[in-house]
């Protein structure tokens, strides 16, 4: 196991490049200020050096908000986005320290979609980002590495990716949303696709509740969305 000093090498940190990407990004992004102790704990637990993009994001940020908060990239956690990457994945993609994760949840969006780095359980393309869509409740291979995923969220056509899923005044609603919440809709987004997003009722739910409702092996959809 490497020490924190071995994992953090400022002169070799990927953050040097990533911060330049962020400064020149086409899409709106906000780097959330980190809590130093949380950053150190998350990085040490993960044993990921800051020379890697994921290690740099964990150590240098409390998370990154993309497209006015629509998409949340997990860092080491913060008041605004109170989920560190390793803390969030514990009991979901791995259950013991040192265990190889079957996937790593690295980002999510406000409509209940999840981005995960495949460790082998999501498909054959190990090391690629998969997206769990709330439109069809299925994992889709985006064929991005983590680094390519960061480049895409910063400069790609996010509007096209979520075409038809932005409602009127969505930015105002997202601004009020807690980083531990997502929106769920009635009817669900995977039902009655002819119904426009603005014609669906929506409510905020705790993201842990949402995750368990979608991925718990038993009673998959029986958890009450009203539970905070």
Curated annotation (Swiss-Prot):
Pfam families the UniProt entry points to? DUF2625
- Tell me the protein family, please: To E.coli YbfG.
Q: What is this protein called?
A: Uncharacterized protein HI_0374
Q: Which organism is it from?
A: Haemophilus influenzae (strain ATCC 51907 / DSM 11121 / KW20 / Rd)
């Amino acid at each position: 196991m490497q020490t924190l000093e071995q994992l953090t090498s400022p002169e070799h940190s990927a953050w040097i490049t990533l911060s330049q990407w962020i400064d020149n990004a086409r899409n709106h992004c906000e780097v959330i200020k980190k809590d130093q102790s949380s950053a150190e704990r998350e990085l040490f637990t993960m044993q990921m050096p800051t020379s890697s993009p994921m290690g740099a994001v964990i150590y240098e940020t409390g998370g990154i908000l993309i497209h006015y908060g629509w998409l949340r990239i997990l860092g080491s956690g913060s008041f605004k986005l109170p989920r560190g990457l390793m803390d969030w994945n514990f009991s979901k993609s791995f259950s013991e320290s040192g265990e190889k994760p079957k996937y790593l949840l690295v980002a999510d969006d406000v409509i209940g979609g999840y981005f995960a780095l495949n460790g082998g359980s999501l498909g054959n393309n190990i090391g690629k980002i998969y997206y769990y869509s709330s439109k069809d409740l299925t994992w889709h291979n985006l064929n991005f590495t983590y680094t390519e995923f960061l480049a895409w969220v910063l400069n790609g056509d996010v509007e096209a990716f979520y075409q038809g899923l932005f409602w009127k005044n969505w930015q105002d609603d997202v601004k009020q949303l807690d980083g531990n919440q997502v929106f769920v809709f009635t009817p669900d987004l995977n039902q009655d696709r002819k119904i426009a997003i603005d014609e669906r009722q929506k409510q905020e739910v705790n993201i842990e509740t949402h995750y368990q409702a979608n991925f718990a092996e038993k009673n998959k959809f029986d958890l009450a969305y009203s539970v905070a």
